[in-house]
Amino acid sequence: MLVQSRSQTQSSVVDSSKPKIDYDVVIVGGGIVGATLACGLKDSGLKITIIESQQPEVAISKKQAYALTLQTGRILKSIGVWDEIVTKITTFYQINLSDSDYHKVVQFMCQDLGTDQLGYVGEHGIILSAMYEFLSQCPNISWQCPASLKNVNYHPDYVEVEIENQGDLNTFYGKIIVAADGSKSRLREEAGIKTHGWKYWQSCIAMTIKTEKSHQNIAFERFWPSGPMGVLPLPGNRCQVVWTAPHAEAQALKELDETEFLKLLEYRTGGLLGKLELLSDRYVYPVQLMQSDRYIQHRLALVGDAAHCCHPVGGQGLNMGIRDGGALAEVLKIATQKGEDIGQKRVLKRYEGWRQKENLIVLGLTDFLDRTFSGNWTLKVGLRRLGLGVLTKVQIFRYLALRLMTGLIGRAPKLNPEIHG
């Protein structure tokens, strides 16, 4: 991809031949985060297009499920898609936190937080299908699909975008382009935005299982020396398992005979779910922490994995991206109402200042949890079990931990005053 920028000294020349703006917002990436942003702009008066390389039926076929925080539920409700999603996903009312074979279990309950639930677990296809159906009814939003981005030229007053759609090259013009194209974002890389972080010594192995015993709408997070294991309840007495282990061990687990694998998984879940059955393949992917130096530049904004990636412990990754999408939608809507140019850095810095610091806190917290709760050094084991004991006995610490886990700390996007107050 070729990305070019014209200096501000050429603005008088560019202004004299300024093309007609086709779209106010160009979103590259039609996944959940990009779709969240588009849904959030449904009534903004802005004209939006989404560039997506995959056909919708392919995009929604991804076999993955996510923990969704209370804050994520509020954001999705405010943009109008939650009612279609919530009836098809699981609401959980308890979180059990434990350390390998240690007998103490921290049980987080709704009354610890003063809410009716603690979170949700939703499958990728259900969430994205609801968003796609919603977007199909928005006259101000269009799709370029399947299409790939070829060139981007940044001008003082607009961004020039060239795409390839079924062999044809098309060029159009927008006020801002948004990178929702994942952790290997070409838009970010070609814009010269640097990232910092590291690859962990671990990979995740993810799968869907069917359980003999009811999961009772409880989410489990169990820490082992090799890494954490999350078990998330799904409808139909199914669970999504995310098992973190060193790279070689994760690959060995993927290749292990199914019967032996299930025996090991039954042991790791403490027998609480009874006999287990695999309903999906075992998917292995590496784990990394990444934070972009900048979330914005002139006429460009990064959201979701294009801006940051975190360890899966606590299930915060997608929730961070959805908050990015909601926050950017709010910033762009308010700027539009004020008559501001939504692609200018002074507007986009409001989004960056809001989300970059909040995401850094979550990145630091997930990294701390993984490093603290992994390993079998005597001092580490003693400290983490002391921490679990404190959480068991001191209600205020449970309350604060739950505020973090449920996304209720920090500034929330306010896309619908009737919901957010």
Residue ranges and their predicted role:
Residues 4-6, 330-421:
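C-terminal helical "tail/cap" subdomain of flavin- and related membrane-associated enzymes
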Residues 18-22, 88-190, 198-203:
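Conserved N-terminal helical subregion
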Residues 33, 56, 184:
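Conserved Rossmann-like nucleotide-cofactor binding loop
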Residues 42-64:
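Glycine-rich FAD pyrophosphate-binding loop
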Residues 76, 158, 166-171, 176-282, ...:
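Conserved FAD-binding catalytic core of PHBH/FMO-like flavoproteins
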Residues 251-343:
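FAD/FMN-dependent oxidoreductases across multiple families
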